[in-house]
Design a protein with these regions (language model features):
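Short amphipathic alpha-helical segments
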Residues: 11-15, 82-84
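Arg/Lys-rich, alpha-helical DNA-contact motif
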Residues: 61-62, 71
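Short, recurring structural edge motifs at helix starts
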Residues: 4, 74-75
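The feature marks the first
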Residues: 2-3, 13
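Short hydrophobic beta-strand elements that form part
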Residues: 16-17, 88
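Mid-chain, well-packed structural core segment of small domains
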Residues: 75-105
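Core segments of cupin and vicinal oxygen chelate
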Residues: 6-10, 17-61, 95-98, 102-103, ...
């Protein structure tokens, strides 16, 4: 990398964890580890059924998405790999995306969108 990075990573916004059974994930992350359950989200297009949980307070809140596939045989396979993705707070997202693509970084086929 020859040029300076033109953006700053401000923090972690989310961590997405996949498995074949989100109830088992929830039993560990909510019941044992104490994360707060927020709400559920389901999308046939994204092949995902997830529980959205949180840890931390205020500016230090991190979303933890516990995801299972609606159909394990279809793509995307949200359970493979188990650590599916992380979300970062970035000070200049359009600049970051353009620069990272120039560095050869690939993004999800669905693109970058708010809350994902």
């Amino acid at each position: 990398m020859s040029e300076a990075r033109p953006f700053n990573v401000l923090g972690v916004q989310q961590v997405a964890i996949g498995g074949l059974d989100k109830n088992k994930l929830r039993a560990f992350w909510v019941d044992i580890m104490g994360l707060r359950y927020g709400h559920s989200y389901k999308s046939e297009k994204e092949n995902v059924d997830e529980d959205i949980c949180e840890t931390g307070v205020g500016a230090f809140t991190v979303e933890v998405d516990l995801m299972q596939p609606i159909d394990p045989d279809k793509r995307p396979k949200v359970h493979e790999p188990a650590l599916n993705h992380i979300g970062l707070w970035i000070d200049d997202l359009p600049t970051a995306v353009a620069w990272l693509e120039g560095q050869g970084v690939r993004f999800t086929p669905g693109g970058i969108r708010k809350g994902a």
